[in-house]
Amino acid sequence: FPINRVEKIGYIQKLLEQEKTELPPEEKTETLATDRHNFRITDDAIGIGGAKEKFRNNMAAINLLHELEIENRLATPEEQEVLSRYVGWGGLSMAFDEHNAAWAEEFKELYASLSPEEYRAAMESTLTAFYTPPVVIKAMYDALDRLGFSQGNILEPSCGTGNFFGLLPESMQNSKLHGVEIDSLTGRIAKQLYQKANIAIEGFEKTNLPDDHFDVVIGNVPFGEIRVNDSRYNAQKFLIHDYFFAKALDKVRAGGVVMFITSKGTMDKASPEVRKYIAQRAE
């Protein structure tokens, strides 16, 4: 369910008296804004396929990304089609097993294609990097449309390659897109796919985004028995999925919407503390 941020009138008046906090400046580039293209996802079957097919698509995207970076240029619309088929390494742990004879060639190719840092991050993501099906994202945007949202500042704090951006409805295309992605390889692909978006490649806990700014914070947040080190929230001892809710509520403006996919760990856990925290700050 969407969560609407609410505040007392005195707090709103105080905000209006303060100077507006600006977002970090966009990265400087010689590429003209008119030459930039945001990819549009039109295939609901994106990400569907067997393990070997996903591997081949991933490798094609990685090799193209490295080529683009060597040539210091942005992807063309045709090249964005190739990049869009990157689905990460969730469910592909066999590609990292040097003792798996059925994947011996794939292991060699993968190991040779990635830097040590990229390889380590990819291997660590095999249990966590699962992408959101288009049908789910479309349903979330339908709900957002029914709430009356048409355009504004949208933040996706765990954006992956940017499927939430790629499925943005036509009616919301005038929105300003902001993404955060902790994985370098995935974030770099997202930057090539959504060239007009402002995407930061770092953990959500390290982002310097203004409070009370975004109209919508949307996405599929990470989950697990992991605590994020963020001094602003450490006292609450939030697990990672709950932390994303807490920080998102501070980033969204009063009257804005937080709309997340999360595990049952947020709404069904025995302790009510996280639910109390959310209820005190939103409706």
Model-derived features: where do they sit?
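A short SAM/SAH-binding and catalytic strip from SAM-dependent methyltransferases
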Residues: I218-E225
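A short acidic, Gly/Pro-enriched loop at the edge of an enzyme's catalytic core
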Residues: N208-I218
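Conserved SAM-binding strand-loop segment of SAM-dependent methyltransferases
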Residues: K196-F204
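Short glycine-enriched, charge-decorated loop/helix-capping segments at active-site entrances
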Residues: S231-Q236
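Class I S-adenosyl-L-methionine
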Residues: L32-L193
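Repeat-associated, polar segments at repeat-unit boundaries in modular proteins
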Residues: P2-K20
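Conserved beta-strand segments of alpha/beta enzyme cores
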Residues: K176, A197-N198, E283
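Conserved Class I SAM-dependent methyltransferase catalytic core
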Residues: V180-S184, F238-E283
